[in-house]
Amino acid sequence: MRPNLTIILAGGSGSRLGLSTPTQFFKVAGKMFVEHPIDAFERNPHISEIAIVSNPFYVADMENIVLQGGWKKVKRILKGGKERYDSSLAAIRAYSGQDVNLVFHDAVRPLVSQRIIDDVCDALTRCEAIDVTLPAVDTIICAEGDHIGSIPDRSLLQRGQTPQAFRLSVIETAYERALKDPDFKVTDDCGVVVKYMPEVPVFLVPGEEANMKLTYKEDTYLIDKFFQLRGSELPAAPASLDALRGKVAAVFGGSYGIGHDIVAQLYAAGTRVHAFARSTTGTDVGSRESVAEALQ
């Protein structure tokens, strides 16, 4: 079986956020951003080796981080370049000629899950190129100046994340073709394959909202909250709803959707249910006073 090698892309400079410190060195949940994905890929049994592509001015810093982290799978620290594709090319050239898969991941996506890594590695046993995506939730427009030119069908649109994974020979050939194009311009590695090796289909693996990228300062608060949610251990659910028979339950948002379904299941289990919602009881769950009044 072809080995899966993870490439952590940590070549950013922090300029997009207007900062002098690269974002991969920001701290969240007690660690630098770059440490979290290294931890995740280190733990995954499907990953054989990890290489980190660093901003050339911070290679020594990255070496110190690796020494302190004690990760056994980190074998190389490579120098990136000015553009994102320069970092990808550094890894491709470092492993050129080897029969391996490369799994590229942004250092500033600290919440990549084991489920995503597992699914990507599983797909690599059948496919030569993989992207991780989520459905578009907002309406996307194509602008013509300061007017709407067209509105694509949202059901066909996906938001790209990482990891993006490839058989090395595929991504290497795609970049060889791309670099011969004087108008070469893409934003990620899957874009290179789609444009320059259209004969290779790119398989889609479902992503996760938590697998977000640090792009703006405000993102740090969202990412920190995702870490808090991930770290919260929920109590084990009862084997059946029989344990709730004769109990009393309060359900906020119980007039429709998931809340309505929960109310129905509780009623069926013999639970005494009090359902509150703005549309039925005038309860505003965003107001402490309104919630307190409902519970009196």
Residue ranges and their predicted role:
Residues 11, 249-253, 276:
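Conserved N-terminal Rossmann-fold NAD(P)-binding element of oxidoreductases
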Residues 111-203:
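Conserved core of the sugar-phosphate nucleotidyltransferase
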Residues 2-59:
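N-terminal glycine-rich phosphate-binding loop and ensuing alpha1 helix
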Residues 34-99, 181-182:
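Conserved N-terminal catalytic core of the sugar/cofactor nucleotidyltransferase
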Residues 30, 107, 254:
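NAD(P)H cofactor-binding loop motif with strongest signal on the N-terminal glycine-rich segment
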Residues 77, 278-290, 296:
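Rossmann-fold cofactor-recognition segment
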Residues 14, 255, 263:
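N-terminal Rossmann NAD(P)H-binding glycine-rich loop of SDR-like oxidoreductase domains
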Residues 50-51, 270-283:
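Conserved glycine-rich Rossmann-like NAD(P)H-binding loop of the short-chain dehydrogenase/reductase
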